[in-house]
Amino acid sequence: MAISSVVSNFELLVKPLVQPSADILGAGRTIIQGYFLSISNLNSNSAVTLRLNFRAQTSNISANSLLAFWDVNGNNSLLNPVFSSATNQIYQVTVPARDTGLFILQPNVAEPKIVDAANTELRGYLVTSLASPFGTTKYNLLLSPEHRGTFLPRGYRTHLRSQELRASLLSIS
């Protein structure tokens, strides 16, 4: 990895699949979609600390209620951004040598009002960079971005049989 790289686009959603006014068949479901990034550190000697800069121009990213998690050892640890503005939200993660971590960014579905409103739609792109560009500036990393989503049926509060999707994203390196 160079000191900084664009990885992929992202789209975070809590939205109806079909707009209610157009749902003449009554098939409308709500999708909750998050962004998942697997990061493998292929280096045998050193951990790498990265900054993940999520950039969104048309939507105020800091005004959206989001959750971020980092998982290397089976514990989804809640992350807070190290920087947040209207157009950027930056997280910092460390991947041990020869290990893989999973970063998750999703709408805050722990807040029922977010799911009930079904009005979250945030798009942008991710730029990764070394947290400290001094010292070793060349790391062999494997980045695998994807979207994962859950479809909630109508009346989801009483009938929790959902379907899920997983889609790999094109990445730039």
Where are these predicted regions, by residue range?
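Intrinsically disordered, low-complexity Pro/Gly/Ser/Thr-rich segments with frequent PxxP/GP/PP motifs
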Residues: 58-116
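Terminal connector regions
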Residues: 97, 102-172
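Asparagine-centered strand-capping/turn motif at beta-strand->loop junctions
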Residues: 27, 33, 38-61
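Conserved long hydrophobic alpha-helices within structured protein cores
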Residues: 1-15, 47-56, 62-68, 98
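Hydrophobic beta-strand residues in large extracellular and virion-surface proteins
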Residues: 39, 50-52, 93-95, 126-128
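Beta-sheet-dominated interaction scaffolds and their linkers
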Residues: 2-38, 156-173
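Sterically constrained small-residue positions within well-ordered secondary structures
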Residues: 28, 41-43, 84, 117-119
